[in-house]
Amino acid sequence: MTYALFLLSVILVMGFVGFSSKPSPIYGGLVLIISGAVGCAVILNCGGGYMGLVVFLVYLGGMMVVFGYTTAMAIEEYPEAWGSGAEVLVSVLVGLVMEVGLVLWVKECDGVVVAVNFNSVGSWMIYEGEGSGLIREDPIGAGALYDYGRWLVVVTGWTLFVGVYVVIEIARGN
């Protein structure tokens, strides 16, 4: 499990390197979607099944609509890929080399003090399987949000709708 969490973290950082190089809006949106899915897998790996599912549905359901509209409005005939320009390719390669170098340095050097010990990720876990508890905390929190914070949910939904409308209008040029 520790290696899976470490691998997911490396993939997440490499996704952010791919997004920060910004070759084209199409590829940037694709890398954000992949990074969001990997981030949800990290949450699932730490035991937050409900929270990982909700984040996956909200992020990938809502943001893919926004990415679809903005990409359709800003589409290029020949989009620039990560290997098409020298500066974009160099920035991606520098980021990947730095990530791999950091991983190898932390793995090989015994004198490196790591702030997070990967052998004790139990304190990061949302739900550990030990004990006789039958009620998990994350669905109860979502139920309380929809029960006591119903107006907050309505305002948040309206704000997201207005945000999508504003992005579409700005991308269209009106």
From Swiss-Prot:
The chain crosses the membrane at residues 1-21, 24-44, 47-67, 86-106, 111-131, 151-171. It catalyses: a ubiquinone + NADH + 5 H(+)(in) = a ubiquinol + NAD(+) + 4 H(+)(out). Its main location: mitochondrion. GO terms for biological process: mitochondrial electron transport, NADH to ubiquinone; mitochondrial respiratory chain complex I assembly. It is a multi-pass membrane protein. It holds the Pfam family Oxidored_q3. GO terms for molecular function: NADH dehydrogenase (ubiquinone) activity. It is an enzyme of class 7 (translocase). It is found in: Mitochondrion inner membrane. Its EC number is 7.1.1.2. Keywords: Electron transport, Membrane, Mitochondrion, Mitochondrion inner membrane, NAD, Respiratory chain, Translocase, Transmembrane, Transmembrane helix, Transport, Ubiquinone. InterPro entries: ComplexI_Subunit6 (IPR050269), NADH_UbQ/plastoQ_OxRdtase_su6 (IPR001457). GO terms for cellular component: mitochondrial inner membrane. Belongs to the complex I subunit 6 family. Core subunit of respiratory chain NADH dehydrogenase (Complex I) which is composed of 45 different subunits. PANTHER family: NADH UBIQUINONE OXIDOREDUCTASE SUBUNIT ND6 (PTHR11435), NADH-UBIQUINONE OXIDOREDUCTASE CHAIN 6 (PTHR11435:SF1). Core subunit of the mitochondrial membrane respiratory chain NADH dehydrogenase (Complex I) which catalyzes electron transfer from NADH through the respiratory chain, using ubiquinone as an electron acceptor. Essential for the catalytic activity and assembly of complex I. This is NADH-ubiquinone oxidoreductase chain 6. It comes from Pongo pygmaeus (Bornean orangutan). The gene is MT-ND6.
